[in-house]
């Protein structure tokens, strides 16, 4: 585990894009990221986050690199801090099937930005060019390179995981609480046995194939 000093240095290193934007005259820099582009079931969720200038949040990193315990701690820390501005966007399975997952992801991001308390004047977006009235910078692997995007990734991931746990209560046979809708061996087996439920993405190949094979609830 990294020391406090090492974590603080890492936070500063990953603030380079935010600092550059501020040097260019921007003041409300929001990181934007998504969770749930790849799963076979459940919504796609986006997070947006504006971190206060001059405040260090130890441990902030790409949500995929954190343990569930670390991620939950940071999620609650970000939400409970009155100086942190967080927004969430959620796009349904029906909408994903209607417009495709890429466009649905962009819609979720726009929703997340709109749900922020303040209006950002610059966006740092993980991996996507986002058509938006606010100027933006696409950053490849941004969740590992920008603290604002990393914070947004934590918000999106934890929020979506909570939604999938709720879906598990409704459809326990699929194991949504464990794989969160991703195409694990156990999920594919359940899909083959039970067929898709209303929360499966019917435009995604394994789900589409199960429908074509005539497996239905």
Curated annotation (Swiss-Prot):
Co-factor requirement: Mn(2+); Mg(2+)
Protein species of origin: Chlamydia trachomatis serovar D (strain ATCC VR-885 / DSM 19411 / UW-3/Cx)
Function per UniProt: Endonuclease that specifically degrades the RNA of RNA-DNA hybrids.
The encoding gene: rnhB
Catalytic reaction equation(s): Endonucleolytic cleavage to 5'-phosphomonoester
Entry-linked NCBIfam families: PRK00015.1-1 (NF000594), PRK00015.1-3 (NF000595)
GO biological process, one term: mismatch repair
Localization in the cell: Cytoplasm
One Pfam family cited in the UniProt record for this chain: RNase_HII
PANTHER family hit by this protein: RIBONUCLEASE H2 SUBUNIT A (PTHR10954), RIBONUCLEASE HII (PTHR10954:SF18)
HAMAP family the UniProt entry points to: RNase_HII_B
High-level lineage: Bacteria, Pseudomonadati, Chlamydiota, Chlamydiia, Chlamydiales
Top-level division of the source organism's lineage: Bacteria
Name of the molecule in the record: Ribonuclease HII
GO molecular function: manganese ion binding; RNA binding; RNA-DNA hybrid ribonuclease activity
InterPro entries, A to Z: RNase_HII, RNase_HII/HIII, RNase_HII/HIII_dom, RNaseH-like_sf, RNaseH_sf
Broad class of where this protein is predominantly found: cytoplasm
EC number: 3.1.26.4
UniProt KW keywords: Cytoplasm, Endonuclease, Hydrolase, Manganese, Metal-binding, Nuclease
Family, as annotated: Belongs to the RNase HII family.
Cofactor: how and how many bound: Manganese or magnesium. Binds 1 divalent metal ion per monomer in the absence of substrate. May bind a second metal ion after substrate binding.
GO cellular component: a single term: cytoplasm
